[in-house]
């Protein structure tokens, strides 16, 4: 079957909903659809806890927010994109206020702000510690006012259709029925989130399998800066559930097994009773996660069945503050760790959290393929560089989701197709994909290979090779191992051949793309022979601006081989310098 829309947004999280709203606002005459693997309110945006950064205080400035972001990203951020981001973030948060987002308030009724890691001013808006949930709920309620926006909930996009170099639609499968549909579009926007599930221990929801990255990669768009994987310093052991940075912003301390605030040993300042901006627990995430590794190597972490941990101490904050500003943290600790942070230490360890890399786009979300756009964690614009600052991701998906929506609306209005229907080339692509999906559904496999085993081996390879610290030999081995996993995947089978909610088929389709994304991560890491931000090479321990002040671009050739190149970083105002914290 075939459907047709002017614009299709793939992904129903924060970036996808904001893009769809922007399209409806820009040109109400355009036919818009959202294709989402889950119901929108189950998207991973709901898991963002801490807040959203934007300059609104008289003592703050756009330049300071931009400089914090650029230095936090170890000077790999494109500064034109950063300047656009910080300029537009305030109006996006105010717009959410007008749409009903329940931001936390000061006693005088003004919006409250909290400190966040790497920021020199208090500029992070928050809704207790459920900011992402309230943000997404507000966007979803706003979207529902545009009744003409069609939703394909619980549909999985499997390939993009390309006609004469232009993206003109996609093929998707309905999870509830197994129905395969060709969906034609004048423009497509990818908003499918990150790819944290290529790792075994992550804060990411099960749906974050790099689908949009793989779709773009296979269609011919390059991935950018994929070696930069953010490890958040405070995840609950075993589950990987995030303990928000807001816990440290409100005054939480990180302690080693001796009860010592160990961050003072890693050039992050000296301990103070109250949180100090850009110091100690409010340093950037890459530095805090690296400090954990050093503590472990010194034998100062605590061994548990789920790996080494340190402790997050919130006891001195008291029950009233925790219940007012960190209620979800207390709930998570009780439900998943069986402890009460009001009276007990919280065990934490670094956990894969966010991809700084993604589909290469310009500041309007346009990829190198005409008709294809991307926003949110799927994209790399790049405002995050080598390390994202906490509370920048939510305003990023708002700013660039809106930009991508407006740009796609303009493009679609100028490139609306006639009623002739798809070209013969597009029809052939769609038929080929439908036949492939039918074959995947009937896979019986050879040699007993299982999808779950291949996925587990991929995750183990990524954890070993693309961790907080990396080295050349391990990355080289990882490239070879993932190539072998791709060969094993080709012979794997599935047991469930039904069409109704076939989760085994979904896992197979996800893993196919995950292997491509995983290969891009380790290949990019191998080629970058320096240490910068979240990419730390023990065999190249220094930052090398002469050779690597550039974005890594990875292209996938038609035979599956990768071609790696570099794109200079855009510097407008702030030349590279030392990252200074705690002073």
From Swiss-Prot:
Highest taxon of the lineage: Bacteria
Primary localization: membrane
A GO biological-process term: anaerobic respiration
Binding residue positions for FAD: 11-15, 35-37, 43-51, 155-157, 211, 353-354, 377, 388-394
GO molecular function, one term: succinate dehydrogenase activity
Gene Ontology cellular component annotations, sorted alphabetically: plasma membrane
InterPro entries xref list: FAD-dep_OxRdtase_2_FAD-bd, FAD/NAD-bd_sf, FRD_SDH_FAD_BS, Fum_R/Succ_DH_flav-like_C_sf, Fum_Rdtase/Succ_DH_flav-like_C, Fum_red_fp, SdhA/FrdA/AprA, Succ_DH/fumarate_Rdtase_cat_sf
E.C. number: 1.3.5.1
Oxidoreductase listed as a keyword: yes
Keyword set, alphabetical order: Cell membrane, Electron transport, FAD, Flavoprotein, Membrane, Nucleotide-binding, Oxidoreductase, Transport
Cofactor note: Binds 1 FAD covalently per subunit.
Active-site residue list: 232, 248
Subcellular location: Cell membrane
Keyword Nucleotide-binding applies: yes
Record-annotated membrane-spanning stretches: none
Cofactor: FAD
Swiss-Prot/TrEMBL catalytic activity: a quinone + succinate = fumarate + a quinol; a menaquinone + succinate = a menaquinol + fumarate
Positions bearing Tele-8alpha-FAD histidine: 44
Signal peptide boundaries: none
NCBIfam families the UniProt entry points to: fum_red_Fp (TIGR01176), PRK09231.1 (NF006686), sdhA_frdA_Gneg (TIGR01812)
Family in the record: Belongs to the FAD-dependent oxidoreductase 2 family. FRD/SDH subfamily.
Subunit structure: Part of an enzyme complex containing four subunits: a flavoprotein (FrdA), an iron-sulfur protein (FrdB), and two hydrophobic anchor proteins (FrdC and FrdD).
Official protein name in the record: Fumarate reductase flavoprotein subunit
Native organism: Mycobacterium tuberculosis (strain ATCC 25618 / H37Rv)
Phylogenetic lineage: Bacteria, Bacillati, Actinomycetota, Actinomycetes, Mycobacteriales
């Amino acid at each position: 079957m075939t459907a047709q829309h002017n614009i299709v947004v793939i992904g129903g999280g924060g970036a996808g909903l904001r893009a769809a709203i922007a399209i409806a606002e820009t040109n109400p005459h355009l036919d818009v659809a959202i294709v989402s693997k889950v119901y929108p309110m189950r998207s991973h945006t709901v898991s963002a806890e801490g807040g959203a950064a934007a300059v609104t205080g008289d003592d703050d400035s756009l330049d300071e927010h931009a400089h914090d972001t650029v230095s936090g990203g170890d000077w790999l951020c494109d500064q034109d994109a950063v300047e656009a981001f910080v300029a537009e973030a305030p109006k996006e948060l105010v717009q959410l206020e007008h749409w009903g987002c329940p931001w936390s308030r000061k006693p005088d009724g003004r919006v409250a702000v909290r400190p966040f890691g790497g920021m020199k001013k208090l500029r992070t808006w928050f809704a207790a510690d459920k900011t992402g949930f309230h943000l997404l709920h507000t966007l979803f309620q706003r979207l529902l006012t545009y009744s003409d926006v069609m939703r394909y909930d619980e549909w999985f996009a499997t390939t993009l259709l390309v006609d004469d170099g232009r993206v003109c639609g996609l093929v998707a499968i309905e999870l509830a029925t197994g129905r395969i549909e060709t969906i034609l579009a004048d423009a497509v926007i990818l908003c499918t989130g990150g790819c944290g599930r290529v790792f075994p221990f992550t804060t990411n929801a099960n749906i974050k399998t790099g689908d949009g990255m793989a779709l773009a990669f296979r269609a011919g768009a390059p991935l950018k800066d994929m070696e930069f994987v953010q490890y958040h310093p405070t995840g609950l052991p075993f589950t990987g559930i995030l303990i928000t940075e807001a816990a440290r912003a409100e005054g939480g301390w990180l302690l080693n097994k001796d009860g010592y605030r160990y961050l003072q040993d890693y050039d992050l300042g000296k301990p103070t009773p109250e949180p100090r901006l850009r110091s100690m627990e409010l340093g950037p995430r890459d530095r805090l996660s690296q400090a954990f590794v050093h503590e472990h190597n010194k034998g100062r972490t605590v061994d548990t069945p789920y790996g080494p941990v340190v402790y997050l101490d919130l006891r001195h904050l008291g029950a009233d503050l925790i219940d007012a500003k960190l209620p979800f943290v207390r709930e998570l600790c009780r439900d998943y760790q069986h402890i009460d942070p009001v009276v007990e230490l919280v065990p934490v360890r670094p956990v894969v959290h966010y991809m700084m890399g993604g589909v290469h786009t310009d500041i309007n979300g346009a990829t190198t393929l005409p008709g294809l756009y991307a926003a949110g964690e799927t994209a790399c614009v790049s405002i995050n560089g080598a390390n994202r600052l906490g509370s920048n991701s939510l305003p990023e998906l708002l700013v660039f989701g809106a930009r991508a929506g407006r740009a796609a609306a303009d493009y679609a209005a100028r490139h609306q197709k006639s009623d002739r229907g798809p070209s013969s080339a597009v029809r052939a692509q769609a038929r080929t994909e439908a036949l492939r999906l039918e074959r995947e559904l009937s896979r019986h496999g050879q040699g007993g290979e299982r999808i779950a085993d291949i996925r587990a081996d991929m995750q183990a390879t990524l954890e070993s090779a693309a961790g907080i610290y990396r080295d050349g030999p391990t990355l080289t081995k990882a490239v070879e191992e993932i190539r072998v996993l791709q060969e094993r995947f080709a012979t794997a089978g599935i047991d469930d051949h039904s069409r109704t909610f076939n989760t085994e088929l979904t896992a197979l389709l996800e893993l196919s793309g995950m292997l491509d994304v995983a290969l891009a991560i380790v290949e990019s890491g191998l080629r970058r022979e320096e240490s910068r931000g979240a990419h730390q090479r023990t065999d190249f321990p220094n930052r090398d601006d002469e050779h690597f002040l550039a974005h890594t671009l990875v292209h996938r050739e038609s035979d599956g081989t990768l071609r790696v190149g570099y794109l200079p970083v855009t510097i407008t105002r702030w030349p590279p310098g030392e990252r200074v914290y705690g002073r």
